[in-house]
Amino acid sequence: MWGKMRPVMRRFLKENPNVEVLFRENMPAMQMAMLERRELDAGVWRMATAPSPGFTSLRLHESSFLVAMPEEHPLAARKATPLAALRNEYFVTMPSIHTDWTFLQRVCQSAGFSPMIIREVMEPQTVLAMVSMGIGITLIADSYAQMTWPGVVFRPLEERIPADLYIVYDQQQATPALEKLIAALVN
């Protein structure tokens, strides 16, 4: 919600005071299940390129993963970091039930190594707090770099790893309010 979506949502809510938008934080698999049960009108998550049949996913904006590390980390002096340079680093990440954990495994394995996960925590803010304490590093969407995290620096990876944000919905069930929201988010 910190990226480009925040100002768009702010404007949409101001211009459409009669539209009630409820936010429910859930992992992508839970959002998809709720969409299938018609408990949600739309879901928003990263890299939603293969939703369930019958659902549409539209990219809201392009984003990339960055490496977040303690400000005194030796790699912090670099402008960009190759993924392979993280081979011997300890990672702080979300738990294995979260898509970020699976993502981290896949990305690191594509660079020829398995990540050494030292801590798993529930919230991205806690991940970044642990990074600031020097416990480890993490890969995180670039929208987090828009906020100040004392003791943490964000560096791009030499390889672009997409963290694009998508909205997923059923076009056949889209209400006029949802269509208006999607138009605002996509434009």
For the regions a protein language model found, what residue spans apply to each?
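Mid-protein regulatory/catalytic core that forms ligand/cofactor-binding pockets
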Residues: 20-66
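Hydrophobic hinge/microswitch elements
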Residues: 27-40, 45-46, 97-152
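Short secondary-structure boundary segments
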Residues: 47-48, 71, 142-144, 171
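Short beta-strand->loop
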Residues: 56-66, 138-143, 150-164
